[in-house]
Amino acid sequence: MLISLNWLKQYVDIKESIDEIANALTMIGQEVEAIDIQGKDLDNVVIGQIVEFDKHPNSDRLTLLKVNVGGEEPLQIICGAKNHKLNDKVVVAKIGAVLPGNFKIKKSKIRDVESYGMLCSEAELGFTKESEGIIILPEDAPIGTEYREYMNLNDVIFELEITPNRPDCLSHIGIAREVAAYYNRKVKYPMIEITETIESINTMVKVDIEDKDRCKRYMGRVIKNVKVQESPDWLKSRIRAMGLNPINNIVDITNFVMFEYNQPMHAFDLDKLEGNITIRAAKKNEEITTLDGVDRVLKNGELVIADDEKAIAIAGVIGGQNTQIDNETKNIFVEVAYFTPENIRKTSRELGIFTDSAYRNERGMDVENLSNVMARAVSLIAEVAGGDVLSEVIDKYVEKPQRAEISLNLEKLNKFIGKNLTYDEVGKILTHLDIELKPLGEGTMLLIPPSYRADLTRPADIYEEVIRMYGFDNIEAKIPVMSIESGEENINFKMPRIVRGILKELGLNEVINYSFIPKFTKELFNFGDEVIEIKNPLSEDMAIMRPTLLYSLITNIRDNINRNQTDLKLFEISKTFKNLGAEKDGLAIEDLKVGIILSGREDKNLWNQSKTDYNFYDLKGYLEFLLERLNVTKYSLTRLENSNFHPGASAEIKIGEDIIGVFGELHPNLVNYFGIKREKLFFAELNLTKLLKYIKIKVNYESISKYPEVLRDLAITLDRDILVGDMIKEIKKKVALIEKIDIFDVYSGDKIDKDKKSVAMSIILRDKNRTLTDGDIDTAMNTILELIKDKYNGEIRK
């Protein structure tokens, strides 16, 4: 948003320097992005008067002039324009002037006659691209005065970054309010005077709002017998300061008022209207040629202003050529309206029309200020274009908005901003912001923001206003007074990170999948009624919420194998979902789980070791390592009955009666279903939510024993259905000297009975306090052998 300092000074007294004003604007939230000092290109450009007028002696097309510029002697200047005469007041660029485009004025000789300057046109001064002749000034223009001073071009333009919640600041009066509030000054609003005729507007035109959802207020006035012409210099100066080119006095006034009050408006040629005006939705494929010369077809019911025959404007966005103001216009209809912001935003983007009008309307206007804006525009049009203002105003007001009422507690405000402001201090700040105050007692007040501040709806908004105007620089920085107590990180948040770190140490790669899986998996994996189905799934592949990570990890393996990546060990940590059923009112439970899947061969890329296929014990080892690192030791393994797993190579992990996980080789039929050939898959899933209560947070450390270990190997024959893990736990309970037992071989085959299996293990014995004697070792081994024989019917292999 461009703001002219000269224009701003019309509404508020400003004594501060440019830098001080820029800093103040930034501190109150209207950030200054750039400052443009205008008139720099108009040094040595002054007002002069033609005091002698002769033809050039050597050219019929040139004139030889003497021009009084306030010096001791008139300047001799040669001119090629045709629109000047004796005694005209003109704009003179003296020797040394540098005009826009780096055009330097020097002493020159034209057709053997010297010239000491140049008479300027608007194009040569950079005001327009083309001009028909030089600038002719009014008779009262003071000779010798700098042209930029005369035209009020000694201006400073601030470019501001206005936030979307402050559309009121897209105007000079809006910024004047902000500056006045900051410096505790008053805003000087424009004086408005209108002389009306006896003739009523109701005899000329009527207005009907057909689409009341998108147009909440529409006002109109008629001015007859206007004279459309070039705008006066003061008006052109204001329009140019905003980066626009003047068009004519009527259009320029509508733009002037928009930049003054931030209220877009439009003027129609009344004689080009056919009947009355209706605000309605566009008809299917209705056509309109807009002011930018583009033929547009309206297909989506855009809101339009229409007469009885045609659309004459796209409401709040752009006018139509069929009713535009031109030099022949005599009677005009002036509109100002409130269109809903969401409608303007939608229309502007659909049609690709981004005008100043649309930019403002889509941010929301002050609907209660329309009558004031209309009066201001009509009074200015009558001033610069003459004409007769018809009596009465068309004002169709569909719905008056309800202003917010905010209860403000002084104690809470002071606590928030870190100050101890009094009731009167806060009241003064808010009053300068046009916020109405009603005391409620006990340090509380009821606040009603002005109609142009729709962004103020709650106490926090008021806190911001008080801080802005009190000044951020006036609030001292303080170190918060607080007691800091160290605390432990919540294990619920810490758990996934710990598990992720452990599995990455083991060389597993993490994957992330969607929480939704296809509906057919319900039958494939025998999920039963525990599945939660999505009523409106994005696709068939995302129809149910997964109760297990199994499907996702299998598809990860399949997709990698299809890309010739077969040696894989993956894991995923994510939530699963389970329906508790009708007994629990259809409630669902979420469990955090970790899934692990192995495929192919272990990557031992060493010269002295060959790759080996992953097996049941690799997976079991990963789980044991994970549980050990989590300090979970009191768990047991039992045979798993699950159709998704190989019946002879799967187990479930239990702590007491809680099943915290399952693992094993996936059933070959399931693997084949996914088109995975010649590969065994090993899958494990741990319920981390259940596991949480068994994790030991505190770890006890002990020193490494300085006494030597004793290693004994043992091979035994057992019944095939005996779980070796349970047997090892029982042995450790009986023999305190056992430090570790490792299984290094399991065999079942032709060399032993078909109902038997051979298990070979290494047993490490150690005492922490002394060296073991032969008697200690023999006693321990005999106890182990007796337990294996008596309880598990085992035999020692020799």
Swiss-Prot record:
Protein name from the UniProt record: Phenylalanine--tRNA ligase beta subunit
Cofactor: how bound: Binds 2 magnesium ions per tetramer.
Family from the record: Belongs to the phenylalanyl-tRNA synthetase beta subunit family. Type 1 subfamily.
Keyword check for Ligase: yes
GO molecular function: ATP binding; magnesium ion binding; phenylalanine-tRNA ligase activity; tRNA binding
Gene for this chain: pheT
InterPro entries membership: aa-tRNA-synth_II/BPL/LPL, B3/B4_tRNA-bd, DNA-bd_dom_put_sf, Fdx_antiC-bd, Fdx_antiC-bd_sf, NA-bd_OB-fold, Phe-tRNA-ligase_IIc_bsu, Phe-tRNA-ligase_IIc_bsu_bact
Residue ranges of every copy of the B5 domain listed in the record: 401-477
Known partners and oligomeric status: Tetramer of two alpha and two beta subunits.
EC number(s) on file: 6.1.1.20
Domain (tRNA-binding): residue spans on this chain: 39-148
Taxonomic placement: Bacteria, Fusobacteriati, Fusobacteriota, Fusobacteriia, Fusobacteriales
HAMAP family: Phe_tRNA_synth_beta1
Catalytic reactions on record: tRNA(Phe) + L-phenylalanine + ATP = L-phenylalanyl-tRNA(Phe) + AMP + diphosphate + H(+)
Keywords: Aminoacyl-tRNA synthetase, ATP-binding, Cytoplasm, Ligase, Magnesium, Metal-binding, Nucleotide-binding, Protein biosynthesis, RNA-binding, tRNA-binding
CDD domains on file: PheRS_beta_core, tRNA_bind_bactPheRS
